[in-house]
Amino acid sequence: MAIPVEEAIAALSTFSLEFKSLKEHRAAHFVLLDFPNFNHLDLFSFDPNEMLNGSFQRTVSKCRRMCRGPHGLTYRGDEQPDVQGLAVLLSSERYATNSPIEYSDVAAYRLSLGEDTKAINQLNTLIQEGKEMASLLYTYRSCVKALPQLPDSMKHSQADLYLETYQVLDLEMSRLREIQRWQASAASKLAADMQRFSRPERLVNGPTITHFWSMLKLLDVLVQLDHLKNAKASIPNDFSWYKRTFTQNSVEDILQVLIVFCVESLELDFALLFPERHTLLRVLPVLVVLATSSEKESESLYKRVKMNRLLNIFKMIILKSSDGADNDWSRDIKGNMYDIVVEGFQLLSRWTGRIWEQCAWKFSRPCKEPPSDSQHGSTTFFDYEKVFLMFTTQFYWLWTLDILIDYGHLTTYMQVVRWNYTGEERRALLELIGYIKSIGLMMQRCDTLVSEALWETIHMEVQDFVQDKLDTMLRTTFRKKKDLSRILSDMRTLSADWMANTSKGDPEHNSLETEEMRQSTFYPRPVAPTAAQIHCLQFLICELVSGGNMRKPGGLFGNSGSGIPVEDLKQLETFFYKLSFFLHILDYTATIGTLTDLGFLWFREFYLESSRVIQFPIECSLPWMLVEHVTETQDAGLLESVLIPFDLYNDSAQHALTCLKQRFLYDEIEAEVDLSFDLLVEKLNEIIFTYYKSCAASTLLDSSFTYLCDDGEKYFVKPLRFDAIFKLRRVMVLGRTIDLRSLITQRMNKLFRENIDFLLERFESGDLCGVVELQQLLDILELTHQSISKFLELDSYSLMLSEMQENLSLVSYSSRISSQIWNEMQTDFLPNFILCNTTQRFVRSLKGTHHSSQRSSASTGKAYFYCGSHDLTMAYQGISGLYRDFFGIPHMFAVVKLLGSRSLPGIIRALLDHISSKITAMVPKITALQEALPKSIGLLSFDGGIAGCQKIVHEILTWEAKSEVKTEVLHDLKEIGSALYWMSLLDIVLRQIDTTQFMQSAPWLGLIPGNDGQVKHAYSDNTPFTTLLSAATNAVASSPACPNPSSFLVMAKQAEAASLLYKSNLNSGSVLEYALAFTSAALDRHYSKWSATPKTGFIDITTSKDFYRVFSGLQYSYLEESINPSRKQEMLGDSVAWAGCTIMYLLGQQQHFELFDFSYQFLNVAEVENATVSLYQYSDRNKSPNFLQGYEGILEAMRKARRLNNHVFSMLRARCPLEDKIACAIKPSGAPLHRMKFTNTVSAFETLPQRAT
Amino acid sequence: MARAGGHGMGNPVNVGIAVQADWENREFISNISLNVRRLFDFLLRFEATTKSKLASLNEKLDILERKLEVLEVQVSSATTNPSVFN
């Protein structure tokens, strides 16, 4: 906030501000003394010079920035950027332009203006009354619609009801009658007034310029009133009505004077404020019509004012209103403070006036069809007559904007507003409103800083003129003219400020002083002249130049009849016009208020009346259309202007309350603002959320992919800035202060929760394969959260996630995701997915019911619930589509990441229980199959060859009656196998994660690889981590500069704890090994049933009680069926082998199986047979051995099965060595060896990680 | 000329003295009024600054409150099941 001194000095020298008077300091310190502490707090600095210059510097730099964008985003003490205009004006009192004491002080100057002042006050009262009536008429809404229709049942009380209705309506009618009466009386009073002052023979001073203005304004009000009343009557009728009133009196000459005054003011651009200009433009045609009621009169008028001048004014206006955005305003703002303020006012006036004119233009040219954007033909089409007509209609109505269009069709509000603005025009309008509002705000903010400077400048101008210039004139030009020099000295007397020098109180005396002495007499005083002084000065100048006769031909300063030299005339003219500027500059706040008031853009009473509806929908409202435009285009340049339209609402509410004085209008505006603000906040949230989500998605997208992609640009997000919006804690809307930031934060939190919920629901309605997509989308969401958290104080992501997962409780280890995963595993994954051992993937079996179709179809969410922009969503859907049809390692990574260490054990436990229950359920079925086998099964004989073997096997496997049991057992085995394989996948993933973690923590824990591949501790008692921190602590503690090393000691202790924790985490067990041990324990309960202990102690090779016999039979029949193309056998995948081999291995039957399995024996027989046959037929190798024909398929399937079984066994041997399993063996010598231990050979499956022993 | 004869200023000297006094009085008045306005301006800015600082404080308290609520729920879930921790 504090401005560097150099800058202040630069500002000082640039603008040569002389603000060093002692008074200045005293004045500022007057404020300072009461709040000495705030200086210290640096809320804002209060040094008067620095403050003035500093903020002026800011003002200027703001102005410069203004030339680039609609908002100079500067930050005040409250760190809120200025993206809104003035919400409320402190005071709109016009104490300079309107005399607060009704010019009663004019009499003090003894200028015999009593009559004139009385007339002015009378006219001003009439204007005030007229304005009130006009607002009454404008806001008048038909109350007939509100009256109830008379039902048949109430016919008897008809008369009473009508009486009631009459009484209701009577009140309204009486008001209208009153208006009419008032209008008539006001018109006649105006006419009388004009008549009184148009008689040159009456010895009355006046009319003065203020009087002219009052006349014009009253005429304006009357015209407006009349037009409001007869909204559908054509214009000539109205004119004629006035004509009757005015032609009764002879007022032509004053009308002519007024016309000349209007034309000159317009031509010289003398009206500082646009409302004044519009008044002149509105009244001028009326005056012209009134003054040209007869041929003779019009001749005399056109003698004074050439027709061309009038036409030029109108033409200029029309063409001006049609041209688009103006770029001329951006010229450098230079000069001193007064000039800047004047310039600022002029700019504001020009811009706001332009919006009015543009608005009127739009209203007069409704869009015929909603889709067509074509504009009406350019104005060059119109001939002058039409332009004139156009002009009158347009500006006749500007005050209310309800422009009556007499083009023969009724226009609706929709046509004039909703469809009438193209995107470009909305943008331009929004920017222009932004310029107006922010310049207005800026000027208002430096009100108290510049006002003294302004007063002083005005004082100096006036004093310079009356003391210096007038003196020169008195001594030269007017020396001989007694009358005129009297006027001049009157001017001096009534306004000169001779600063404490009583000897110079006498102007006559003073005029004789030497120039040098006079120069030194006045120095600036920061006091402005009063309204009465300016009023009198203007009057006297008029008197001077016109010689007391305004009705002379030529303009106010155009006549040379007064005998005043041209240069003096020029000076007088300049000063005359300056005087009228002074008033508006003195009314600083009120002028800004008028110039930045754009509330008219909301009002639509005229169209409500003509459309016969109660209110238009919000889409038709211009402010909302602008808000909508910003939210729809999402233009980075416009986003910060999104609150500007709410200034329009502020303005119109202010207008409704203070000018129109109608409560119901305010209520309507309030309701609309409520609605549109809610909508805005919601849309804004969506935009912000979508933007950051797109950014996150774009960041997480593989950059090498987007680089190679032909249209990779579409995955980049156009940058947007929301900083300004995030900082808005005080948005002023209709007098309320709204914390927009907290609203956004609140809704953002809600949006995140909704999004998480949506993603979880989506996962819940799909199958297990959707887990990768879920994880992807949650990752994007997390990154989005991270980037938004940089600006807003959002709830923590992990808490939100666990809240939505229903996982908050400390004692619950399940969550929505984990229960869904388990649910899916149980009902869909284990029964319906089959394993492919080679690809390490599960895929859905063909016959597996696609039960996702039975579920409720996933609700399609909005784009911002996925990845923000459409392109990114498509890209991510493409990626996740790759993972949708299988379950493998990537899915397992996603599962581990989503469940985390908290919920994962629950799943593992549930899965193990599932295995155990499946085994238990399998026991009776296995027993049934065992019973169907013969008591004793021998080895297959080689004699019969393959065919013989097949026959024998078929004889053994008499399970035809039990095919159902067989299928069930196969399915059970498949589920057990799938579960086990799932565990092994989980194991692989967990190992990988553990390894990563190990690699990260090893250097800190001082772990180094030993000789035998084991991990060694480099240091015996402590780790590098603790050493480092304890060394740092010691160094800090020993240093005398550190007064309180306790926190470092705590840190060192914490380091020890951390290294202990990490150390204990190193040797985490293997999930697969645990699962195998668990299965083994579950099997032990059924050991007696599935494994017959040989009575002799030797291997009983003929027994059929062992499990491997059943599995062998199942495998054989399954293989046989699987190659039979005629029977559509359900594919069970590789998990059956996993389950069978695991069970056999854990029961200690692996070697029995490898020896006595039917398929293995079958393969052996085929091999032998093949060898023998090929031996016999070595000469005829090319001839395929026909005895093997028909068996290739089954042999191939058996080989495959054997390979698979071997793989499983070797894996099992590696992961679960059965050291303490005991069996019997026979030594090569033939001696039996009881209770020998298995020796485990080194696994062939060496790719699996070894168990650390 | 409309203001001929006795229509001019009665006694220019008296009027001049009155005007001079008026200037001085008004200087005093405008000094006072300007400084009242400055005071008011300051109060407005002070209010704005305070409001936004309070708003940011409120925001932080809100966050803490919500976090506390979540933690309370977690703790209550633990205290209602003491058996789990034994």
From Swiss-Prot, chain B:
How the protein assembles, per its UniProt entry?
Binds SCAR.
Matching InterPro entries, A to Z?
BRICK1
The compartments listed are: Cytoplasm, Cytoskeleton
What is the native source organism of this protein? Oryza sativa subsp. japonica (Rice)
Family to which the UniProt record says this protein belongs: Belongs to the BRK1 family.
One term under GO cellular component: SCAR complex
Sorted keywords for this record are: Coiled coil, Cytoplasm, Cytoskeleton
Q: Name one molecular function that GO assigns to this entry.
A: protein-containing complex binding
Q: Function, please?
A: Involved in regulation of actin and microtubule organization. Part of a WAVE complex that activates the Arp2/3 complex.
Query: Which GO BP terms sit in this record?
Result: actin filament organization; cell motility; regulation of actin polymerization or depolymerization; trichome morphogenesis
Q: Key word Cytoplasm present in the record?
A: yes
Where are the coiled-coil regions?
47-81
At the top level, the lineage of the source is Eukaryota
Q: What is this protein called?
A: Probable protein BRICK1
Q: Does the keyword Cytoplasm apply?
A: yes
